[in-house]
């Protein structure tokens, strides 16, 4: 009886080799080729289409004799043109009609009516256009398998970092999504249906609350400068007022696209889903005081700063979205006041946000009620944003310190 070694680590187990779609397709083709249990009826039942046969006329008699190089090239080009017309299934009469039509020559030997000749020319044009369409189609193996976009992504990920045989690529291809006509009204059917359903749900939610939800129209800015002031505040406030005066209850939140060199303003987007506000008693149960925040080593030097209307939020969880901040701070929105501006940061400043309130009193109230709240497992730390003068003063104080003998020392130089 064999002894089983229970001390073998998981890393020592041999991983099962993954079979890709190309290898699976190649194996099925091989099994189909080696299968000998095939009857004559099955072979006959398979439909096979072949290209129609054409007449081959060797190029030699016309080129016999002495001629210049330019004459030979012209003769060879005409012969190639005639051969391509024969591949379309045209007979000699139709080839003659087409050549005379292209060259503009009138042949007296053709005794057909102009209507019949025009009909034949239209038929030839259709054959030529159909051949061009077929030639433009992608050339694929007859047994190649069509994969969806997700299957193609999985297939590419399996080959990541390894060499792939080139012939395996011919065994599958990605399906192309159908092209939508821009002028087709059916393209907007899904958007119209979604907007109608969400509007009805918001109206029901508004009736249940018993208050106008339009007063909570909140606008978040797209980017923040180093001083903590919003870019284009007048533009945001105007759009927020227009949204508040509208008929439908909507929440406007701007979206930020992070680029390596600069940031672009994309305008406000509409949140049509109802947002549930977090109750105040739940916030009080799940928040830390300022002393408890200072007991955390990371925030031992926590200081709220000088009160102003801009709050700086940090230590945000990556799961926090705009709607989460709205559920916390929308309670401080005044019915007839300007909208609160939310600015979610991305890139290197991910996990931070700036909130601009109508005045510093509301900002102070929001800080003392929400600061220290545990949101998605992380403590939300709030401070008053610093102006440019305060930031420069803090930098100077951190670089310049006074020695006991009155000399001035510069740290970090």
Curated annotation (Swiss-Prot):
Pfam families with a match to the protein in the record: RRM_1
Record carries keyword RNA-binding: yes
Function noted in UniProt: May bind RNA.
Keyword Membrane part of the UniProt annotation: no
Species this chain originates from: Mus musculus (Mouse)
Annotated segments matching region Disordered: 225-247
Residue intervals passing through the bilayer: none
Start and end residues of each RRM domain: 309-387
GO molecular function: RNA binding
Source organism, top-level taxon: Eukaryota
Keywords, ordered alphabetically: RNA-binding
Entry protein name: RNA-binding protein 41
CDD domains attached to this UniProt entry: RRM2_RBM40_like
